[in-house]
């Protein structure tokens, strides 16, 4: 997938960025380079290869420091939301910023 200068213009418009022609060209080159790397990675046949828990485990025996995923602090949602200007059903209400 290669982007065109028109794609960069559209992305910049959606992100509300003003890019100079030089910045636009540099962005086009960088993004197309990134997509090129992604295409190379997608072309690699990984069927039959077991996933790694850590990439270093391939080259040496590593004791991973994994722990049980447990909450270590009490739920303080209500206390944290007391200073919010608007809350509804436990969620912060914010003004719409995207048209």
Curated annotation (Swiss-Prot):
It is an enzyme of class 6 (ligase). Its EC number is 6.3.5.-. InterPro entries: Asp/Glu-ADT_sf_sub_c, GatC. Pfam families: GatC. GO terms for molecular function: asparaginyl-tRNA synthase (glutamine-hydrolyzing) activity; ATP binding; glutaminyl-tRNA synthase (glutamine-hydrolyzing) activity. Allows the formation of correctly charged Asn-tRNA(Asn) or Gln-tRNA(Gln) through the transamidation of misacylated Asp-tRNA(Asn) or Glu-tRNA(Gln) in organisms which lack either or both of asparaginyl-tRNA or glutaminyl-tRNA synthetases. The reaction takes place in the presence of glutamine and ATP through an activated phospho-Asp-tRNA(Asn) or phospho-Glu-tRNA(Gln). This is Aspartyl/glutamyl-tRNA(Asn/Gln) amidotransferase subunit C. It comes from Acidovorax ebreus (strain TPSY).
